[in-house]
Amino acid sequence: MKKYILLSIIALIFTKAYSQDNSILDAYKDSIINYSTAMVNSNNDKIKIELSDKISGLVFQITEQEKSINYDLSELKFVKVLTSKDKKFRVFTWVIPFTDRTYGYRGITQSYNQYKKEFVSYKLTDKGDKLGFAQNKSLSIKKWYGAYYYKIIETKRGSKKFYTLLGWRGISRTVQSKIIEVVTVKSKGNITFGYNIFDIRNYEYFGKGNRSSKRLIFKFSTQGNMYLNYDYQTIVIASKSKSKSSYKKKKSYKSGFNAQSSPDKAKVKTKSLKDNMIVLDRLVPTSPQMKDFYEFYYPESNIIDALLWQKSKWKYYPDIDARNKTNSNDNAKKPIEYNLVPK
């Protein structure tokens, strides 16, 4: 009986402590909702920045709470929170919509330090406008290619983990972009953005033969909407089978003629593969003369491409058979809501 009472008291203490921790996190969450709503609705850029700074402070307060990695923050509207399945990485991102229709990008990461057995948090500093050839660079938290992330995908190569992020970045009044970013986390929780895990040698948008991309940046018109998400879809793979040439004798009306021979043509085999993959619209210019003028790039109607995780890389497959319904959640078509995307 005494043992039962003691266990009940211990359980009550832990429940009370958990409730207190959650009440603190609830208060931080409510404040973030209020500040972010005010930031988006404000017509004063200085006030927008001040409110964003307050949001940053609250996010850091959340990450400092023990076991906050498990706390549900899906109620946040303007601050997107993505958490890896292994609960070792979390990223917060939001956008400051300035009055001149440009954007500021803010982010904070929470990652696990294996040595100290605790989480560490880092502020991300956007340098996207100053980075030349950003697609080919590994970047640090102080040189972040800022974006609003709306999807996280976890993959592995041996013991090395990759967190692939799908995101949005507004570039100008006429050009926006969708991004496929790759994050790696070191043993001490240090964050690196960008990694060469893309097999896109036949991807015309990035130039055939491309082997150096560490992130993919898809630029297109603000008047269009590009679908980019992680879906369960079908790929039809074609391959030529190598077979030994057989020789068929043909009749000759003249004796002494060598028998003519004709090799068999290579047979094309196809197989359907159904799996989760990154699914995306194909972007094309309105005319060949508009190549590389991204304000004239739009999704091609009814042509869907994909990136499938194969042999530790995201391998490009063109024109997939996208018969399965695509995800309607995660705002994959237009991730920034509430008039944050330029019309």
Question: Each predicted region: which residue ranges?
Answer:
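Beta-propeller blade signature
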Residues: Y105-K116, I179-K188, F293-K311
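Gram-negative outer-membrane assembly/targeting C-terminal domains
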Residues: D305, S312-K343
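Bacterial Sec-dependent N-terminal signal peptides
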Residues: M1-S31
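Start-of-domain marker
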Residues: Q20-V91, V95
